């Protein structure tokens, strides 16, 4: 039953559909087609576009999955976790900026290396700013 239906579609209905399509003789003939003729061509053009895409898809470049990159590339890599302790009472200057991007040459103090890091990666990391409270 199913094979008979498929056979009827392929042998009878598909050729009849293709014969009724308003395919022009020349490329310039496409410019003279009316809106209703274009609408009759849409299913065929859609199927041809889908088949074309499925044919070239294996050759298209694959999108690489973005994986998280390491933040700390070189500072105290021998330690499993880098922790710096600073007593707030020991602040001598009114403001101190500490690095959070791990790119600072003066780590743990920020040297504004995060600006270049943010431009390159689109990240939004910034320093930790400690302010001495004035009474």
UniProtKB/Swiss-Prot annotation:
UniProt keyword annotation of Secreted present: no
The name this protein goes by in its record: CDGSH iron-sulfur domain-containing protein 2
Subunit structure of this chain's protein: Homodimer.
PANTHER family attached to this UniProt entry: CDGSH IRON-SULFUR DOMAIN-CONTAINING PROTEIN 1, CDGSH IRON-SULFUR DOMAIN-CONTAINING PROTEIN 2
The protein's required cofactors: [2Fe-2S] cluster
GO biological process terms held by the UniProt record: autophagy of mitochondrion; regulation of autophagy
GO CC, alphabetical: endoplasmic reticulum membrane; mitochondrial outer membrane
An annotated Gene Ontology molecular function: metal ion binding
Localization in the cell: Endoplasmic reticulum membrane; Mitochondrion outer membrane
Topological domain ranges for the Lumenal compartment: 1-37
Main location: endoplasmic reticulum
Domain of life where this protein originates: Eukaryota
InterPro entries: CISD1/2 (IPR045131), FeS-contain_CDGSH-typ (IPR018967), FeS-contain_mitoNEET_N (IPR019610), MitoNEET_CISD (IPR042216)
Family stated for the protein in its record: Belongs to the CISD protein family. CISD2 subfamily.
Membrane-spanning residues: 38-60
Keywords: 2Fe-2S, Autophagy, Endoplasmic reticulum, Iron, Iron-sulfur, Membrane, Metal-binding, Mitochondrion, Mitochondrion outer membrane, Transmembrane, Transmembrane helix
Protein function: Regulator of autophagy that contributes to antagonize becn1-mediated cellular autophagy at the endoplasmic reticulum. Participates in the interaction of bcl2 with becn1 and is required for bcl2-mediated depression of endoplasmic reticulum Ca(2+) stores during autophagy.
Bilayer topology term: Single-pass membrane protein
Origin species: Danio rerio (Zebrafish)
Binding site for [2Fe-2S] cluster: 99, 101, 110, 114
Co-factor note (free text): Binds 1 [2Fe-2S] cluster.
């Amino acid at each position: 039953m199913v094979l008979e239906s498929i056979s009827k579609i392929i042998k009878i209905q598909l050729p009849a559909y293709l014969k009724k399509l308003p395919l022009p003789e020349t490329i310039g003939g496409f410019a003279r087609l009316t809106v209703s003729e274009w609408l009759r061509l849409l299913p065929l053009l859609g199927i041809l576009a889908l088949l074309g895409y499925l044919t070239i898809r294996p050759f298209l470049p694959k999108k690489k999955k973005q994986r998280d990159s390491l933040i700390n590339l070189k500072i105290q890599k021998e330690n499993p976790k880098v922790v710096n302790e600073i007593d707030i009472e020991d602040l001598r200057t009114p403001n101190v900026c500490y690095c959070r991007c791990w790119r600072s040459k003066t780590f743990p103090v920020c040297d504004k290396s995060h600006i270049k890091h943010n431009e390159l990666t689109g990240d939004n990391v910034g320093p930790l700013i400690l302010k001495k409270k004035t009474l």
